[in-house]
Amino acid sequence: MKVRASVKKVCRHCKVVRRKGVVRVICKDARHKQRQG
């Protein structure tokens, strides 16, 4: 899980999702997981 000021899609499988006011990137590649912090 990377914590970043700006989250971006890395590949075509990435999805930007908003959960409880936190912007996240979920992907089938676990290395692409990100959270906005």
UniProtKB/Swiss-Prot annotation:
UniProt keyword Transmembrane present? no
Q: Extract the InterPro entries matched here.
A: Ribosomal_bL36, Ribosomal_bL36_sp
Please provide the record's keywords in A-Z order.
Answer: Ribonucleoprotein, Ribosomal protein
The answer to whether the entry has keyword Ribosomal protein is yes
A biological process (GO) annotation for this entry?
translation
Q: Tell me which Pfam families the record gives.
A: Ribosomal_L36 (PF00444)
Under PANTHER family, the record lists: 50S RIBOSOMAL PROTEIN L36, CHLOROPLASTIC (PTHR42888), LARGE RIBOSOMAL SUBUNIT PROTEIN BL36C (PTHR42888:SF1)
Supply the NCBIfam families for this chain. Answer: rpmJ_bact
Task: Tell me what this protein is called.
Answer: Large ribosomal subunit protein bL36
Species classification? Bacteria, Pseudomonadati, Pseudomonadota, Gammaproteobacteria, Chromatiales
Name of the encoding gene = rpmJ
